[in-house]
Structures are given as C-alpha cells and as structure tokens.
Amino acid sequence: MNETQMNRISKDKGFIAALDQSGGSTPKALLQYGIKENSYSNDEEMFNLVHEMRKRIIKSTAFNSKYILGAILFENTMYRTIDHKYTADYLWNEKNIVPFLKIDKGLSELENGVQLMKPITNLDELLKAAIEKNIFGTKMRSFIKEANSKGIKMVVDQQFELADKIANQGLVPIIEPEVDIKSTDKEKSEELLKLEISKHLSDLDKETKVMLKLSIPTKDNFYSDLMKDPHVVRIVALSGGYSQSEANERLSRNNGLIASFSRALSENLSIDQTDEEFNETLSNSIKEIYEASIT
C-alpha cells in the first residue's frame, strides 16, 4: 500500500471523481455529453469515445489535486493511456490524484428487495492487474431498493467478503451498497444498512482498512459514528440521481462526508464546447462539489 496515497485519501480536503461508467451506463454518459448512440456501431468505438471524454476531463486544468483527491476508473480505462502513460500513472504522477478501479460486473436480478453483485469470476487476475497498474483501491456496487433486512444483510455480507480478499492484496476496497433515493422506505433501509456495516466492521482484522460509498442519508450526519471507526479510511457519497445542485446541497449538510460523484460531476459538459467553455464548466462544477465536501 502506498502510504503517501493513504495519507492523501484519509486526511486531505477534496472529493473523489467517479469516472467509472461501465458498458451498461456508458451510452447514457455519452448521450449526456452530446454523443448519440448512432455515432458508434460497436463496443470498441463506444469505449474509444468515452475514453476521449474522460481524457478531456482528466487533462483539463480544472481537474486538479487542489479539489480532487482520487478518481475511480472503469477496467477498460486502466489499460488505456493518456500522453503515453497508463491512466493510473498519469493521474498520480502528473496530477497527484489517487487512482481507484471499479471491479464489479454489474447487478443481479432484484431479490429480497436488493440487487447483489454478479459474480466477479476473474477477481484474482483483476486484482493482480490493478496492482501492476499502480491502482490504490477498488470499488464495487450493490443496490438496495427496499428495507428488507434479509436482503440488506446479503448485500453487506457479499460486500465485506470481497473487501476482505481485496484488502489482503494490499488494496483499499470502497464498499458501495447504494440505497435507492426513490425508495419509499429509504430511511429504514439506511438504519438496517448501518447496523449490518457496524457488525462487519467490528469483525475486521485490526489492520484492515476499507472505505464506504453510500447514498446521502435522509437524516443528516447519520453516518458520523461510522467515520470514527478505525477501519474506515473515509466515507464518500454518491449522487444517486439527484441533480448536481441538490446533491451538493444535501451533501453540505453532512459534516465529514465527501462526494464521489459521476453523472453529477459531468453535468453540463458537452463535446461541442470549446476547450475554454469546457474547462470553465468543469471548473465551476468541481469547485461547487468541493465546497459541499469540506463542511
């Protein structure tokens, strides 16, 4: 584990940029950026286009370590380069931004009010590749739609089982059990989720470090006590479908919670913008997300 990166993630002010749209969510991300689905005819062309978008974001002067602590990458992005450097190396060596890797393969069908992660059949190879490419940590997402205690327990059990394997390889896992912001019993789901997370944290080995990526809670500062747990490096929040302004407003009410936004970060960016317009739009978004993350 890179101690310099650990200190940066655990102590510094800023937020984590989520640039990890996968095959399923990439068309939506490109459409938001102004690239229609008829602009590409296969996955390779689609991933080339999204890498150009991510490269434009990462290389922007607005995307800098004053505001951004880390960036979460999609697996395909890890193998690609920016200015002849692998993306993770470019982020750390050129920008002082800590690289993370999304490792999940998407969600299973809804059962017991939740969607577990699909099996990660190539986990060992993926973690080996991540270490070779100088990745600091990983991220994996599950989804909670209903306050079903059995389902939520299954989600957290699966997350921590994987987190243990990841931490044993010297990487820092970001555990992401997202609660649906549209759920009618969101607050109850959050109570059940916190209970399960607390149980698992108390069972971890003394040296094991994890991060949590959670929906912005209904009750302000609901996760404050989890932040104090010695196993927890940082708790970050997903935007979860809120607009950037609403996500920022809700986030700012939660002290110590920092952003890890994806769609809300790239809101209002367009392929048709000049570099000046693009950089200005990105800069405004980054500064506003940063301000909401340092309360």
Swiss-Prot record:
<comment type="pathway">
    <text>Carbohydrate degradation; glycolysis; D-glyceraldehyde 3-phosphate and glycerone phosphate from D-glucose: step 4/4.</text>
</comment>
<comment type="similarity">
    <text>Belongs to the class I fructose-bisphosphate aldolase family.</text>
</comment>
<dbReference type="InterPro" id="IPR023014">
    <property type="entry name" value="FBA_I_Gram+-type"/>
</dbReference>
<dbReference type="GO" id="GO:0004332">
    <property type="term" value="F:fructose-bisphosphate aldolase activity"/>
</dbReference>
<dbReference type="Pfam" id="PF00274">
    <property type="entry name" value="Glycolytic"/>
</dbReference>
<feature type="active site" description="Proton acceptor">
    <location>
        <position position="176"/>
    </location>
</feature>
<keyword id="KW-0456">Lyase</keyword>
<feature type="active site" description="Schiff-base intermediate with dihydroxyacetone-P">
    <location>
        <position position="213"/>
    </location>
</feature>
<keyword id="KW-0614">Plasmid</keyword>
<keyword id="KW-0704">Schiff base</keyword>
<dbReference type="InterPro" id="IPR000741">
    <property type="entry name" value="FBA_I"/>
</dbReference>
<protein>
    <recommendedName>
        <fullName>Fructose-bisphosphate aldolase class 1</fullName>
        <ecNumber>4.1.2.13</ecNumber>
    </recommendedName>
</protein>
<dbReference type="InterPro" id="IPR013785">
    <property type="entry name" value="Aldolase_TIM"/>
</dbReference>
<dbReference type="GO" id="GO:0006096">
    <property type="term" value="P:glycolytic process"/>
</dbReference>
<keyword id="KW-0324">Glycolysis</keyword>
